[in-house]
Regions:
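Positively charged n-region of N-terminal signal peptides that target proteins for export
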Residues: 1-7
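Extracytoplasmic metal-acquisition and chelation regions
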Residues: 7-9, 17-178
Length: 178
């Protein structure tokens, strides 16, 4: 009985904490107090990149949860709403997001848009050579994606251009050390 009470007490504390920390069902772009532009990204990978470069100057909104397969992910109506309400949409490109490509191309910017065909690797898929969308395995391509992301963020929040440029320079230096 004591174990059950302890369990229920811990569960109650966790639920209270989650309720206190959560927002009212996602971001509210019409909120008067909401000053940061919203950057919607497709993956946790890009979410981390935007955080490194822009920090708290933007609000990040993630579409595909960590652990989900982006190649197979099917957008929900809430995802489409995120795309519509975003001030900037960033996605991998190279058909990484599979079934969401059409919606993303209409509204977003692929961080891989500056990649040349000769730089992009290929992989075998069902006996065919196809573009390998996993650019982060190539540090030079990843750095190009960081620069593209930085450019887009500086255009979005021009008052913070110098901080984003500084963060980009530091992040690229960290990548050079890898």
């Amino acid at each position: 009985m004591t174990k059950i009470l302890k369990y229920l007490s811990v569960l109650a504390l966790v639920l209270i904490g989650l309720t206190a920390c959560s927002s009212k069902g996602g971001h509210q772009t019409s909120d008067v107090n909401h000053k940061e532009p919203v950057v919607t990204v497709t993956t946790s990978f890009l979410n981390d990149m935007v955080k490194q470069l822009a920090g708290d100057y933007v609000k990040r909104d993630l579409i595909i949860p960590a652990g989900e397969d982006p190649h197979l992910y099917v957008a929900k109506s809430s995802d489409l709403k995120k795309l519509q309400e975003a001030d900037l949409v960033l996605y991998h490109g190279l058909h990484f997001e599979g079934k969401m490509v059409d919606a993303l191309e209409a509204k977003g910017t692929a961080v891989t848009k500056g990649f040349s065909k000769k730089d992009i690797g290929t992989m075998d898929e069902d006996g065919e050579k196809v573009v390998d969308p996993h650019f982060w395995f190539d540090i030079d391509l990843y750095k190009k994606a960081v620069k593209e992301t930085s450019k887009e963020l500086k255009e979005l929040v021009p008052d913070h251009r110098s901080d984003i440029a500084k963060n980009t320079k530091e992040y690229l230096a960290e990548l050079d050390d890898l």
